[in-house]
């Protein structure tokens, strides 16, 4: 069982990253709310891991804190919610927003998340409302809005490739290609990095 990785951050291709630990490169999928907080490529990173073993694959889901990982594990306990959908849910809104939406039974907000229909949103509320009491959601994540995006410049070099990267990331989170392209084009501005485009696209849906 892999619980934590500490090593050199080699690649950042949202929502995936590659981290080298003792000469071995690990591919890790990470919610965008966590991805925004990663250090620059070439520096040391510490990532808490949720390890999934399937017949056809071994998957690593990464988080910056144990609390983020704990919330993810609570989300995927809900009926019909697997790791992929859990990743999309915690990419579409911050932990605080998600906890507040569940506590307030805000179905209309939850259904805006990729892959979350009305029935899934209702299940999340029914099954998670009691479990999330006392979580203190305010400190689960470092607010993404305060993160400097300067370090993201090593991800993407040209505006068009940044937009392509953002669209690909949104598709991998569950949005349809046409919808992903529309989301990015509506928020795109000159010199925006892929991470900025993804963040603003996701914010526009909530």
From Swiss-Prot:
Pfam families per the UniProt record, alphabetical: HHH_5, RuvA_C, RuvA_N
Subcellular location: Cytoplasm
Record region (Flexible linker): 144-157
UniProt GO molecular function: ATP binding; four-way junction DNA binding; four-way junction helicase activity
Spans annotated as Domain III: 158-206
Alphabetized UniProt keyword annotations: Cytoplasm, DNA damage, DNA recombination, DNA repair, DNA-binding
Any Gene Ontology biological process: DNA repair
GO cellular component terms, semicolon-separated: cytoplasm; Holliday junction helicase complex; Holliday junction resolvase complex
Residue span of region Domain I: 1-64
Region (Domain II): 65-143
Function: The RuvA-RuvB-RuvC complex processes Holliday junction (HJ) DNA during genetic recombination and DNA repair, while the RuvA-RuvB complex plays an important role in the rescue of blocked DNA replication forks via replication fork reversal (RFR). RuvA specifically binds to HJ cruciform DNA, conferring on it an open structure. The RuvB hexamer acts as an ATP-dependent pump, pulling dsDNA into and through the RuvAB complex. HJ branch migration allows RuvC to scan DNA until it finds its consensus sequence, where it cleaves and resolves the cruciform DNA.
Subunit structure comment from the entry: Homotetramer. Forms an RuvA(8)-RuvB(12)-Holliday junction (HJ) complex. HJ DNA is sandwiched between 2 RuvA tetramers; dsDNA enters through RuvA and exits via RuvB. An RuvB hexamer assembles on each DNA strand where it exits the tetramer. Each RuvB hexamer is contacted by two RuvA subunits (via domain III) on 2 adjacent RuvB subunits; this complex drives branch migration. In the full resolvosome a probable DNA-RuvA(4)-RuvB(12)-RuvC(2) complex forms which resolves the HJ.
Protein family according to the UniProt entry: Belongs to the RuvA family.
Notes concerning its domains: Has three domains with a flexible linker between the domains II and III and assumes an 'L' shape. Domain III is highly mobile and contacts RuvB.
Listed name of the protein: Holliday junction branch migration complex subunit RuvA
């Amino acid at each position: 069982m892999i619980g934590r990785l500490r090593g050199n951050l080699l690649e950042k291709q949202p929502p995936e990253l590659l981290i080298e630990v003792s000469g071995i490169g690990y591919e890790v999928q990470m919610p965008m709310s966590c991805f925004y907080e990663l250090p620059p490529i070439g520096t040391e990173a510490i990532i808490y891991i949720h390890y999934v073993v399937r017949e056809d694959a071994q998957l690593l889901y990464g988080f910056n804190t144990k609390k983020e990982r704990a919330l993810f594990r609570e989300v995927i306990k809900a009926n019909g919610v697997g790791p992929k959908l859990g990743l999309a849910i915690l990419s579409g809104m911050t932990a605080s927003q998600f906890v507040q939406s569940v506590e307030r039974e805000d179905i209309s907000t939850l259904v805006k998340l990729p892959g979350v229909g009305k029935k899934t949103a209702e299940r999340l509320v029914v099954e998670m409302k009691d479990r999330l009491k006392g979580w203190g959601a305010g400190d689960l994540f470092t607010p993404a809005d305060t993160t400097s995006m300067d370090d993201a410049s090593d991800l993407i070099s040209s505006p068009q490739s940044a937009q392509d990267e953002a669209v690909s990331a949104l598709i991998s989170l569950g949005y349809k290609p046409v919808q992903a392209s529309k989301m990015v084009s509506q928020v795109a501005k000159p010199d925006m990095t892929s991470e900025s485009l993804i963040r603003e696209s996701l914010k526009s849906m909530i």
